[in-house]
């Protein structure tokens, strides 16, 4: 059984901070489809459209009928553990620093046999006395992103076990906020306050909550979350580089997860309002504010990516499903989020070398004041915050919470041009 994670002793400031060595990242183009699915929290394998055989490892032609018509499809993950072994030596620096490492061979119910990483509880069950009576333990295989941002396969126990998320190997594949220190950039909004509550429920050790306009605290709900023992209020104005730099100098070396939820949202297109003041305000926070924050806190996260059990691990961007295709009634807001999405892809590429996960969140309309005139369904702040915490635990890179976001994503994947035409027509 996995032992619960405990708060480690305070770090000796004189000791050298280890540098991150990421696992091997080389993958072929076909195999990257496995990573693309894992980034969204799905376990997919290739399936032949002619003979229905499920394939692994990824390939160009079916191993049974040689057909090239292979489609990536989500799999249940159920299977049987056939064999296990323990890796005690590796020339790869990532694994060398984390030995011993459990590996296994799993026969999937859908067909292929997979070499997988073993969750500690599976390995213990396979090595224990009960293994003689049940040598082929039932397992649940899932895809996770490793510290290099590439998909790996992990065999989990068929049924949930106590403290399952605290497994040493699994924590290398996730960004669980439990016992970690988190910065939430805007605590004045319902989403920011919901994030704080969700993080506390998930076991976060300390949460810094940013506020740009302290004179607006009354009636904003900020006093309620400030009263929580895990919360520390900090001044943070993303439109002011001096404010961002000062906060990074004060807490940058302690933050494990940054959640950038600060945004300006106005409901204008191009012709609805003369001038550029509203669009500038949106870009100033949604894009340039994000850029200032990334420049100030990014190097600190990278420097602590291998700093013990509770190392720096993740950056979360609250974007919008409007970043994929412009929603004309909120046209300038959509444009600012599209710019932020592009910047987030650059940030992900830069932080990947240090093993820092960048989670981009693309919610549909949030149930707040600026979406008042949009009809349901709209996602609540609490539902959005819960989805973000779950995505951190699962180690995902892309999250589309809410019914509208899921629908738009499917339409965008099917045909981006058709979605553009539908949105222009108000559909």
What are these regions (language model features)?
Residues 245, 263-280, 303-309, 329:
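Conserved mid-core segment of classical short-chain dehydrogenase/reductases
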Residues 360, 368, 372-413:
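C-terminal helical subdomain
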Residues 188-189:
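Conserved glycine-rich cofactor-binding loop
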Residues 294-295, 345:
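A short, exposed helix-loop element centered on a Lys and neighboring polar residues
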Residues 204-221:
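Conserved glycine-rich Rossmann-like NAD(P)H-binding loop of the short-chain dehydrogenase/reductase
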């Amino acid at each position: 059984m996995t032992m619960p994670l405990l708060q480690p002793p305070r770090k000796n400031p004189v000791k050298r901070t280890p540098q991150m060595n990421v696992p091997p990242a080389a993958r072929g183009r076909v195999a990257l489809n496995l990573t693309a699915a894992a980034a969204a929290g799905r376990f997919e394998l290739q399936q032949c459209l002619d003979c229905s055989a499920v394939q692994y490892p990824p390939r160009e032609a079916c191993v049974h009928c040689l057909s090239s018509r292979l489609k990536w499809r989500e799999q249940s993950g159920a299977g049987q553990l056939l064999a296990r072994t323990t890796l005690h030596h590796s020339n790869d620096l990532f694994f060398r620093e984390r030995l011993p490492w459990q590996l296994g061979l799993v026969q999937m119910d859908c067909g292929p046999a997979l070499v997988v990483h073993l969750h500690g509880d599976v390995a213990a069950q396979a090595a224990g006395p009960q293994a003689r009576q049940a040598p082929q333990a039932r397992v649940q295989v899932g895809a996770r992103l490793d510290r290099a941002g590439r998909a790996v396969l992990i065999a989990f126990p068929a049924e949930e076990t106590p403290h399952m998320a605290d497994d040493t190997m699994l924590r290398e594949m996730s960004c669980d906020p439990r016992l970690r220190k988190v910065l939430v950039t805007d605590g004045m909004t319902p989403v920011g306050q919901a994030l704080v509550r969700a993080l506390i429920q998930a076991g976060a050790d300390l949460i810094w909550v940013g506020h740009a306009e302290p004179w607006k605290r009354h009636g904003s709900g900020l006093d309620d979350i400030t009263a929580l023992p895990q919360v520390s209020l900090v001044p943070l104005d993303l439109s002011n580089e001096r404010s961002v730099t000062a906060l990074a100098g004060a807490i940058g070396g302690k933050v494990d997860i940054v959640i950038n939820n600060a945004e300006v949202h106005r409901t204008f297109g191009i012709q609805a309002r003369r001038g550029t003041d509203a669009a500038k305000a949106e870009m100033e926070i949604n894009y340039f504010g994000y850029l200032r924050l990334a420049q100030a806190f990014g190097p600190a996260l990278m420097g602590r990516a291998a700093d013990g059990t509770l190392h720096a691990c993740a950056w979360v961007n609250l974007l919008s499903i409007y970043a994929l295709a412009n929603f004309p009634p909120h046209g300038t807001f959509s444009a600012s989020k599209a710019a932020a999405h592009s910047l987030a892809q650059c940030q992900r590429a830069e932080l990947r070398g240090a093993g820092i996960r960048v989670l981009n969140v693309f919610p549909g309309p949030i149930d707040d004041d600026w979406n008042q005139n949009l009809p349901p369904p709209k996602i609540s702040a609490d539902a959005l915050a819960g989805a973000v915490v779950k995505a951190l635990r699962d180690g995902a890179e892309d999250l589309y919470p809410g019914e509208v976001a899921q629908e738009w994503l499917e339409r965008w994947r099917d045909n981006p041009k058709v979605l553009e035409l539908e949105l222009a027509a108000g559909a």
